[in-house]
Structures are given as C-alpha cells and as structure tokens.
A protein has these predicted regions:
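Conserved catalytic core of Hanks-type protein kinase domains
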Residues: 37, 70, 218, 249
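Bacterial Sec-dependent N-terminal signal peptides
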Residues: 1-19, 187, 215, 277, ...
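Short polar/acidic secondary-structure junctions
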Residues: 39, 72, 104, 188, ...
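Detector for outer-membrane/organellar transmembrane beta-barrel domains
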Residues: 141-230
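Outer-membrane beta-barrel translocator/channel fold
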Residues: 18-31, 35, 50-59, 79-153, ...
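N-terminal glycine-rich anion-binding loops that anchor highly charged ligand groups
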Residues: 35-44
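Glycine- and aromatic-enriched membrane insertion/assembly motifs of diderm outer-membrane
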Residues: 56-78, 157
C-alpha cells in the first residue's frame, strides 16, 4: 500500500509541476510555446513565486524563472526556464531550453518555429532498494507562433516526453502531452486603453476539451488587469477555475504582477481542503526594452 501510494504521488507531482508552468501563460507565453522565444526581441528575465496556504508552514511552494531574448538581428530567439516545485517532503525540479527561428511576413508580422528540450528530475520509489531515488526524465516540446500588431496565434505541444518505469516495469510517470492552440488580438479603446481578448484551447488524449476565455486590459502602459475562466485545465485535475491578476509597470525596465487562482488544479488533494486558492507573484526585468510589450 505504501509503495503504491508513493508511486502515485510522485507521478502526480511531476504532472503538477507542468501544470504550474502552463497556468502562467498569460504572463509568460514561453511556458506553453517554445516558438515565443525572442518575440519581444529584447532580453527579459521573469521570476515567479507561487504558494498555497500562506499561513501554513511547509505549504506547497513553487519557484520558477523564465528568460528569453533574440540574436542575429532578431531572427533567432533563445529561451530558458527552470523551476523547483516542493510539496511537503517531495520536490521536483526542471530546466528547459528553447530556440526559435523567426520568418518575416507581410505587414511587419513574424512567424516563428520553436523547439524546447530539457529535463525533469523527480523522486521515484525503487522497490528493489526500498528507497527514493531521483530520476531524470527528458522533456521535449515544439510550437509555431504568429505575431503582428493586430493579431497573435500559436499552436504547440509543450510536452512530448515519454514515460518512466521502475525496476519491475511498472509505469511511475506518463506525460500528459497536451496540444494547445492560442489566439488573441490587442484592441485599442481610446488613446490610453488597450483590451486584449484571447482564447486557449487544449486537448489531452482521453480527456474533455479544455477551453480558457481570457481578457486583459492595460491603461496608459502602466497598469494592467486580467481575468481568465478556465474549463478542464490541462493538469492532473480536470477542474474549472478563475484566474485574476494585476500588473504594474514600476519603471521602464521593471514590472510587478500578482495572480490569484480560485482553485489549485495542480494539487492532487486540492479539493479536500477548505482553502483551495493559490497566490503567485511575478517580477520581470527588461533592461533594454525596445518598446512596451503587453
């Protein structure tokens, strides 16, 4: 019973780890599509801290960083992501690198094709030694991204990794392998307000179709608000939840954001607790921003 429970929990935690990244896509599109790398053309570094049960010691917590930029006159984008996801005594880590090649399109639009490779390091229970050992699991992803001043869209498979078995041949981890399609458009409302409605459709084999309906608003290129309704999120738990966030451009180079999720889709036991919500903060540094990016 203990062995089965441990194996199940470690498998759940790795899938949970990926869901943490997926949920950040409105603030960090690189988390679901490697073709986004370098789309801003200037370097940027983002740090995220995600925590559940703020008043509880040893509560689930995730730290992640994301960085990307462009080289070769903007034709090649490079990206990097890393995270550490801890829940009680269990912790998983991951690091992923992305590269994208950008094609010039009519009307100053860009079309990018991107690839991602990396590794997840997860705790696996070894029945032959009755001990927990860390296993490295390859992570692969691909994507296509189109961007213009009036429209953006992308399709991606952010996780094409395989599966892991223990010494007895039992599966202890299988990648969920979601396929994602995203589209949206910035709409100017007056001289100082921009609305950005968008949609994300995700599909995982043998699961219902996931649909996110999103709306962001920026005012004077200084303050932003966002709301997202997510149905059948692409994580361990198929759940519907709301995500709300606020962003503030402290300086030309520094942006701060706060995100609130009404549910914790990445936690296998989230529905058993009274406090189901989770909080996240982001700090972004863009030292040489060429223009304001939403």
């Amino acid at each position: 019973m203990f062995i089965s429970s441990f194996i199940l929990l470690t498998s759940q935690r790795v899938q949970a780890q990926k869901e943490v990244l997926y949920s950040q896509y409105l603030l960090n599109p690189l988390s679901i599509n490697p073709a986004y790398a370098g789309s801003r053309e200037s370097f940027q570094l983002s740090a995220f801290l995600r925590r559940k049960w703020i008043s509880v010691r040893y509560a689930p917590v995730t730290q992640s960083v994301s960085a990307d930029g462009a080289i070769a006159n903007g034709r090649i984008g490079l990206g990097f992501q890393a995270l550490n996801d801890r829940m009680g005594l269990f912790a998983t880590t991951g690091a992923y690198g992305s590269v994208a090649y950008r094609f010039n399109m009519p009307a100053l639009a860009k079309l990018s094709i991107g690839f991602q490779g990396g590794v997840n390091v997860i705790p696996i229970y070894d029945v032959t030694t009755a001990a927990s050992i860390n296993r490295a699991v390859a992570s692969l992803g691909v994507g296509v991204y189109y961007q213009s001043d009036r429209f953006f869209a992308g399709i991606s498979a952010p996780e094409l990794g395989g599966q892991v078995t223990d010494a007895t041949g039992r599966y202890v981890y299988k990648s969920a392998r979601p396929i994602m399609f995203q589209a949206g458009a910035p709409i100017e409302v007056g001289e100082t307000t921009v609305l950005i409605p968008s949609l994300l459709v995700s599909k995982i084999a043998d699961r219902p179709l996931g649909v996110d309906i999103n709306l962001r608003a920026w005012f004077d290129e200084e303050f932003g608000l966002g709301l997202s309704y997510r149905q059948n999120s692409p994580g361990l738990i198929q759940t519907n939840y709301l995500q709300a966030f606020a962003e503030y451009q402290l300086t030309k180079a520094i942006r701060l954001a706060y995100t609130f999720n009404s549910q914790t889709p990445e936690s296998p036991n989230a529905m058993q607790y009274d406090q189901k919500s989770v909080h996240e903060i982001m700090l972004r540094f863009s030292p040489n921003a060429l223009k304001f990016m939403y």
